[in-house]
Amino acid sequence: MPRLLIHVEGETEETFVNEALAPHLYGFGYQKISARLLGNSRNRNRRGGIRGWNSVRDDIVNHLKEDAGCLATTMVDYYALPAETGPKEWPGRRLATQRPFPQRATTVQQALLEDICTELGDHFNPTRFIPYVMMHEFEGLLFSDCTRFAEAIGRPQLGTQFQAIRDAFSSPEEINDDMLTAPSKRVEALVPGYEKPLLGTLAILEIGLDTIREQCPNFRAWVEQLERWVQ
């Protein structure tokens, strides 16, 4: 039975995988599903933040080499990826800025896959690495059902305000204007002291993966790939 390791950006995503995504995917035949913060164990930042690609690639490649029966994937925020030229730059990140919004995440995902395949050589099965890049923060997914989001965090009166934010965008995955209006910043403005890992996970469990998949096409495509891999 296959094993899945999800390389995540921060503690919020790590908790999401362990509490919400893994229980769903176990029903498709995985033997083990775990999350690992990007970078090596000595330098992990449990508050999030993306390391340079060279370091992350080494982590992913080592995992794929050490366990021939595993699948690797990522869960990272596009806007947090280093784009500057040099060893920290993530493949496809600068190119993606020249693409229409719907193509930006897939541009980076394809570049990451190509780089991993190049590193591992011709004998590597590319289906063993499924990169996933969220256009914005994890909190964007929570706007898939604003009423349940507000209820889950104990602020039911905020449902209307959350919905007003959601209605300004085509999908929850597009909620952002700049660094000051990222999804988490919008939530924190309405919920002082918002605790991302705890409240975010409570909201995800209340909203449910089915609703998020319905509202967030990139997320849906990723989960469907993970489901199909073991079928």
Name each model feature, range by range.
Residues 1, 14-43, 57-231:
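C-terminal accessory helical subdomains adjacent to catalytic cores in phosphodiester-
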Residues 43-55:
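Charged, often glycine-rich, active-site loop that binds/positions anionic groups
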Residues 6-15:
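Catalytic nucleophile-elbow at a beta strand-turn-alpha helix junction centered on a G-D-S/GDSL motif
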